[in-house]
Amino acid sequence: MAKIKKKGTSGQAKNYITRTQAVRKLQISLPDFRRLCIFKGIYPREPRNKKKAAKNSTASTTFYYTKDIQYLLHEPLLRKFRDQKALSKKIARSLGRGEVSDAARLEKNHAPQLTLDHIIKERYPTFIDALRDLDDALSLLFLFANLPSTAHVPPKTIALCQRLCHEFQHYLIVTNSLRKSFLSIKGIYYQATIQGQDIMWLVPYRFVQRVNGDVDYRIMATFVDFYTTLLGFVNFRLYSTLGLRYPPKFDTRSDENGAELAAFTLEGRAVGETTKAIEGTKQTSSTANKEVSQDVQAKVDKVIKSAGLDQTKDDQAVQATEESTEEIDKFEPAAPEADTLLQPDISGDTAGALFAPFTFYISREAPKAPLEFILRSFGCKRIGWDAVLGDGAFTHDETDTRITHQIVDRPALPESSLPAVPAASENGAGAVQKVKPGTRIPGRTYIQPQWIWDCINEGKLLRPDLYAPGATLPPHLSPWVKPTRGAYDPRASLAEQEEEGEAEIAAEEEEEDSDEEMEEATDGKKVDAKAEDSAEEENEDEDDSVDGGMDVAGTDDDEDESEEEMEDEFGGFEEEAASESEDEEESARTQHQKELEAEAAGLPFSSSSAGGDSTKKKSSQAKKVASKKRKEEEELERQKMMMSRKKRKLLEKMMYSNKKQSEEAAKLRSKRRKLEKGAEK
């Protein structure tokens, strides 16, 4: 006889464990259990049957894998948590005795330090794994870098997040790894490519943040502890691959003055000593060269001139080989039936030097931090701003002639409303000349900040006149959403997106609406006049009423007349079939009548009949489109009859989604059409 299997020893009851059982098994508190799970990357699971997994009738809410909890039993951090618990008991005992100094000494000298280095190595065995998990880390650290310091968010945490984020930005600037950016309601999205991995993160706008009390900052602080360690490892590895010393030199005084990115100085690993040695050899060689006679120097110059032609040829050959090696690779399919890959149209080096030849000046109202980061990431070396925005600028003088582009984010105002010229900040030779706000310096291009984002997303310099101060900006679209067929594209014109006959139908509908409004207005006037006449008649005929206010039944003659009217109204199906021909004959008659009237008046017929011809063309075009659409629907229905039920259902779903998309696009096009016509008026 087979042994009876005991309940709860296999299946879901064995594979899952509740949170209460896990806390008891690990012998730690619930907050420490949460921190440990966040550090180790263990998350709650959802069993198929909660009652079977809980081994009782009461369904628990949180479950974990039993193997995960068994894995946590060997974690070295458990000992740190237990030491912290024992230390807290000692501190509480000292405070109970009134020994405050002993409690402070215990907390200062015996507090266990948590190190997460081994957890980073366990969770990310390769560097590519760490890069793939960097999106959430960057988003959270940039968020904490812009938060105000409170009791829940200490200043040390904010300073650490700011330092790590600026170090990561410096790597992107040096390597030109930033690819795209997008301004959204939530914040600014960035995308960078590091070692073939696309990393996207969100940076909030620098508004005044109001910290709410419903946010659990203890959980977020745990994630910050883990992500700061992760980003520190990643920055060290990235700097090491470039041969840079990590951490970079940080100027605290400059950072206090608002330098931000300029407060960091990148240094090569053991490069400074070599440069000094080279400089020393240059100095010794320069002193030795003084002793060389002029005759020897003249002979050397002759040799260089004689070999100049061959040298230029060699240089040209080297440049040609370099240009040939720097060409963009073409992805050709291996077989004719293979998929065709998208061909790159621009290289990373070309995109990284997009703003290299320009000198930018950021006005006070423009966001300095994101603009400086993007401009430096795309090759710009000379960026100036007002001294109010902080240190680290190429120039603080707005009248500097080297400035080629100025970023302005204020509306164009008349000269009378502009404020007076502010006083200079310094006196003497180093005084910075102030410019009246709103003035334009000749020889300089003025643009709005959106021009920077649209240029880097397109990979080329766009027309600056479309982004001039006070101009209506083009639509700023996400670079990660590509336009699909049938969807509305705000960058394209209406003529490119409209379907066949859509514009004529819309114009006809607008004319009908305007005619209806005019008819309603005239009918309203007629109704008011009739109401006044009827009121006067009622007042006159009140005494002459014969029926005494009672309804009188109709006679037989009235019934016969009503039947004859009904028969006259229904003309049969032949009349409906011949309605189109009668309409054409009527329109021809009216047109001939208008020609005669125009001839009698001595006017050309084209001016008097332009409106009628346009309406006739529009109505005929609408009829053609409707008939064509009806034929296509009939043909589609015939094709659907030959399909199986499964394919027919799938086709109906596809048609439904396409119809919804086309209806939404039609609504947006009609809205845009009305706005454009309103702007023309």
Curated annotation (Swiss-Prot):
Residues 489-681 are annotated as: Disordered. Residues 522-533, 587-597, 630-640 have a biased composition (Basic and acidic residues). Residues 350-469 form the BRCT domain. It is found in: Nucleus, Nucleolus; Nucleus, Nucleoplasm. Residues 496-521, 534-546, 554-586 have a biased composition (Acidic residues). One of its GO terms (molecular function) is RNA binding. Its main location: nucleus. PROSITE patterns: BRCT (PS50172). Pfam families: Pescadillo_N (PF06732). Residues 617-629 have a biased composition (Basic residues). Keywords: Coiled coil, Nucleus, Ribosome biogenesis, rRNA processing. Residues 491-527, 574-681 form a coiled coil. GO terms for biological process: maturation of 5.8S rRNA from tricistronic rRNA transcript (SSU-rRNA, 5.8S rRNA, LSU-rRNA); maturation of LSU-rRNA from tricistronic rRNA transcript (SSU-rRNA, 5.8S rRNA, LSU-rRNA). One of its GO terms (cellular component) is preribosome, large subunit precursor. InterPro entries: BRCT_dom, BRCT_dom_sf, PES. Belongs to the pescadillo family. Component of the NOP7 complex, composed of erb1, nop7 and ytm1. The complex is held together by erb1, which interacts with nop7 via its N-terminal domain and with ytm1 via a high-affinity interaction between the seven-bladed beta-propeller domains of the 2 proteins. The NOP7 complex associates with the 66S pre-ribosome. Component of the NOP7 complex, which is required for maturation of the 25S and 5.8S ribosomal RNAs and formation of the 60S ribosome. This is Pescadillo homolog. It comes from Aspergillus oryzae (strain ATCC 42149 / RIB 40). The gene is nop7.
